[in-house]
Amino acid sequence: ASYKVTLKLDDGSEAVIDCDEDSFILDVAEEEGIDIPFSCRSGSCSTCAGKIEGGTVDQSEQTFLDDDQMEEGYVLTCVAYPTSDCTILTHQEEEMIG
């Protein structure tokens, strides 16, 4: 299956990508030329963090976020697969760390 992922970028613009259920959101965004920050690419830091505004993802491979952060909607886009159409606010590392 493929899902529409709407990325709300830090400059106020939005980008919509078609992301397969077995593709990481960050990888597809990069292929489309969308600038999302990243560092480790393995779900063990917070550089690529986003916040889900709607829809669902599978980020079971991540090791950085705690349960509270995930309940608040934070997502590591480098290890997140879409499980529905979803909307993600990008560039959320500073907001998340506070």
From Swiss-Prot:
InterPro entries in alphabetical order: 2Fe-2S_ferredoxin-like_sf, 2Fe-2S_ferredoxin-type, 2Fe2S_fd_BS, Beta-grasp_dom_sf, Fd_pln
Function in brief: Ferredoxins are iron-sulfur proteins that transfer electrons in a wide variety of metabolic reactions.
CDD domains the record matches: fer2
Keywords: 2Fe-2S, Chloroplast, Electron transport, Iron, Iron-sulfur, Metal-binding, Plastid, Transport
Keyword Disulfide bond annotated: no
Chief subcellular location: plastid
This protein's name: Ferredoxin
Family: Belongs to the 2Fe2S plant-type ferredoxin family.
GO BP field: electron transport chain
Presence of keyword Iron-sulfur: yes
Organism: Bryopsis maxima
Record text on cofactor binding: Binds 1 [2Fe-2S] cluster.
Molecular function terms from GO: 2 iron, 2 sulfur cluster binding; electron transfer activity; metal ion binding
